């Protein structure tokens, strides 16, 4: 289980450059709109130094990180919800993703044209958010018409669903985001099947120049917008990231040291996406493989077992658990057992990030 994050943005904001760096896919990042029409998909390993630390102790035959999927969706333009600039296709592609990474241009460069002729992150964000809201408004209005008929017939579920739709309708009419409405669990469940675009967790990826991480008024503007929406901002320099992506591991370390950076910005993008979707990692560690697995925060041990195989959940008996810190501190399973840090947990155990687990099951 990974997740699918759609990378969106206006044409020429650095979206494909960023995606290429993420996946080393080498898509045509040409300096004109719509050079990405079919979405390009890349599966990216989740950067997690804990895997290497576990492998140092266990000495497995192989190491397998958990992954996530990024989808490069063509540059959206004003009017996309009415089909402008191949808009319908783009919006349908976004609908299939779990989260949105919205790339916003926060740099000046006369060689790279901006579709609106000027750099204004607020305008750029408004343009895309308006298109997403208009697409949702269309879905919402059609749903209301259908639900009214069922509600009149006394359908309780339809009545509740209708009340939620009527709650979000005025927000969408004002080009607002459904995610800022503060719907409760029951309300969210009622409209889940509609896959609303403005309900998807969103991070703003601010594409800056090499020296644009500080004292950058464009970046400050994006942070202000995100704070109002409850969204995350991850500043990166796509140009630097594409250079880093071409280097081997040794050169990468040197290059980052020269720039005074601890890790590639893309690692922050991937981790922010992970957090956005409320995901966490647990590990299995044996001589055959040390492997990372993705589960939702709050998942029980049987649900975590199901990620490996559904049989593990069906026949779940117990989970053997060692906290990651204990596994490292006591140099593996035997040391953790001697220190009393190895434990057996039942089906109600809530998995913690970094747990090293082994499942006992019977099918």
Curated annotation (Swiss-Prot):
Transmembrane segments: none annotated. It comes from the Bacteria. This is Ribosome-binding ATPase YchF. Residues 3-256 form the OBG-type G domain. CDD domains: TGS_YchF_OLA1, YchF. Mg(2+) binds at residues 16, 36. ATPase that binds to both the 70S ribosome and the 50S ribosomal subunit in a nucleotide-independent manner. Does not hydrolyze GTP. Belongs to the TRAFAC class OBG-HflX-like GTPase superfamily. OBG GTPase family. YchF/OLA1 subfamily. HAMAP family: YchF_OLA1_ATPase. Composed of 3 distinct structural domains: the N-terminal domain, which has a mononucleotide binding fold typical for the P-loop NTPases, followed by a pronounced alpha-helical coiled coil domain and the C-terminal domain, which may be involved in RNA binding. Its cofactor is Mg(2+).
């Amino acid at each position: 289980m990974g997740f699918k994050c759609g990378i969106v943005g206006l044409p020429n904001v650095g979206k494909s450059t960023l995606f290429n760096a993420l996946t080393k896919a080498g898509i045509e990042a040409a300096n004109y709109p719509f050079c990405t029409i079919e979405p390009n998909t890349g599966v990216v390993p989740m950067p997690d130094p804990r895997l290497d630390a576990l492998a140092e102790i266990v000495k497995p035959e192989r190491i397998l990180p958990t992954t996530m999927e990024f989808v490069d969706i063509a540059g959206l333009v004003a009017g996309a919800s009415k089909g402008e600039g191949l808009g319908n296709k783009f919006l349908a592609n976004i609908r299939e993703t779990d989260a949105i990474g919205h790339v916003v241009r926060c740099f000046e460069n006369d060689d790279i044209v901006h579709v609106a002729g000027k750099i204004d992150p607020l305008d750029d964000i408004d343009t895309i958010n308006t298109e997403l809201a208009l697409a949702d408004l269309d879905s919402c209005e059609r749903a209301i018409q259908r639900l009214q008929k069922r509600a009149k017939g006394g359908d309780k579920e339809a009545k509740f669903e209708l009340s939620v739709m009527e709650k979000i309708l005025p927000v969408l009419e004002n080009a607002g985001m459904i995610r800022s409405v503060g719907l409760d669990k029951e309300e969210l469940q009622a409209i889940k099947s509609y896959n609303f675009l403005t309900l998807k967790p969103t991070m703003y990826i601010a594409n800056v120049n090499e020296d644009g991480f500080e004292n950058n008024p464009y970046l400050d503007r994006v942070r202000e917008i995100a704070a109002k929406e409850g969204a995350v901002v991850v500043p990166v320099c796509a140009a630097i990231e594409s250079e880093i992506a071409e280097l081997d591991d040794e050169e990468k370390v040197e290059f980052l040291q020269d720039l005074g950076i601890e890790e590639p910005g893309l690692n922050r993008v991937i981790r922010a996406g992970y957090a956005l979707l409320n995901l966490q990692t647990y590990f299995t560690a044996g001589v055959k493989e040390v492997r990372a697995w993705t589960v939702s925060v709050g998942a029980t041990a049987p649900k975590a077992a199901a990620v490996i195989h559904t049989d593990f959940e069906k026949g779940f008996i117990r989970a053997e658990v060692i906290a990651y810190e204990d596994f490292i501190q006591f140099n593996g399973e035997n040391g953790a057992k001697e220190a009393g840090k190895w434990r057996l947990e039942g089906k109600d155990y809530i998995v913690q990030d970094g747990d090293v687990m082994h499942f006992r099951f019977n099918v």
